[in-house]
Each structure stands twice: as structure tokens, then as C-alpha cells.
Amino acid sequence: IQSILKARLKDQTKILIAGCGTGYELEYLFEQFPTASFVAFDPSEQMIRNAQRRFQHKKDSSRIKFIVGDTSSLTAYKNQFDVALAILVSHFLVATEKKRYFKEIFNSVNDPGFLISYDLMKFQNPVQIQQLQHLTQSLGLSEKQSEAMVERLDDDFHLITIDDMQQLLRNSGFHRTEYFTQISNFYGIISEQ
């Protein structure tokens, strides 16, 4: 993601983090793009507090505005952002929420801005689920944790196919979508205005 952003963004860029969680990627991007300004939102007040803690002692933390809320918070930011990042968020949203999420992000991104999304997509066969288990274990989950994750897939995730995701993004207004990476069933997609 960093290489995509470095190649496409200018100084003084405005970046939206659409679902910032604990602020992990926000902290990384804050360091990599020292002249950028950020708006980071999450519907969880606890997650926003966790993210804010990462920046308590950082110089220039005023470059970040934190918002407790969902994409409806973006109505005040029409055409404001050069890029939006939606990392590991939409796979938790039901279909109607996914549509609203991406449409509101589209409305907040300027032209020629773009969206980078990265999410888990629908499995086509049982082997892909096994691959996901092995991947998550190689990234630090225990066998028991990865089994619990697989058992919760149907309850916690609302997965769609990569083709359906690209169509959803186009229906939201983005003109061109292409995926730039795939790891197991996690796809990174660039969607352009």
C-alpha cells in the first residue's frame, strides 16, 4: 500500500481512513507521509480511544482528526480526500451496509482521487479455508485461534466474491477497479474516480 500511495500522492495530501480500528495503519502512514493530513473514523468509541493513544506523544498529531461514527459522518467531507483507505472493514458489513459504505466513501474522494480497499472475499472451495487457517497461523494465531476464526466465518463475516466486490465498487461510482494483490482470499483493490 505504501508504494501505491508514494507513487500516486503529492505533498499536503488528504487521507481518509475509513474504519481506523486501533490506528495501526494510521500510525504507519502518519510516519511515512509527514505532510499529509488525516481523517480517521470508526464506529467504536473504544477503538478511537486506542488509536488516539498511539498519537499522545507524537509531534504534529494535530494532522489527524478522529471521529467516532460511520460513513454517515462523511457528509461534511464531500470531495475532500485524495485517497481513502478501507482496510479489513467491508467484509464485516452486510450487503446494504457495504453499498452505503462505499457510496459515501466515493462521495468524499475528490477527482482524480482513489480508494484502496483490502478485504477477505468469499471462498470458492474448502481448500481455501484451510489455506486461510495456515496463513493466519503463520502470522501468529495459534491453531486453536485459527480454528475459532474459521468457525465464526459465517457469523462474523459477510463475504462476497471478488467479482461482486468490483461490481459493487463500480456501482458506487468508481470508474475503474483492479486488484493489486491477493493473499489467500484477501484482495487489495484500487478503485479510481
Regions found by a protein language model. Give the residues of each.
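A short glycine-rich, Lys/Arg-flanked "PGG" loop and its adjoining helix->strand segment in the class I
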Residues: 99-111
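A conserved beta-strand element that flanks and buttresses the S-adenosyl-L-methionine
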Residues: 85
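Short catalytic micro-motifs in class I SAM-dependent methyltransferases
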Residues: 88-91
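Core SAM-dependent methyltransferase catalytic element
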Residues: 172-193
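Short glycine-centered segments of the SAM/dcSAM-binding site in methyltransferase folds
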Residues: 14, 112-114
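Class I SAM-dependent methyltransferase SAM/SAH-binding core
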Residues: 16-17, 22-73
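C-terminal alpha-helical "lid/dimerization" subdomain adjacent to the S-adenosyl-L-methionine
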Residues: 118-172, 178
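Conserved alpha-helix/loop element of class I SAM-dependent methyltransferases that forms part
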Residues: 1-11
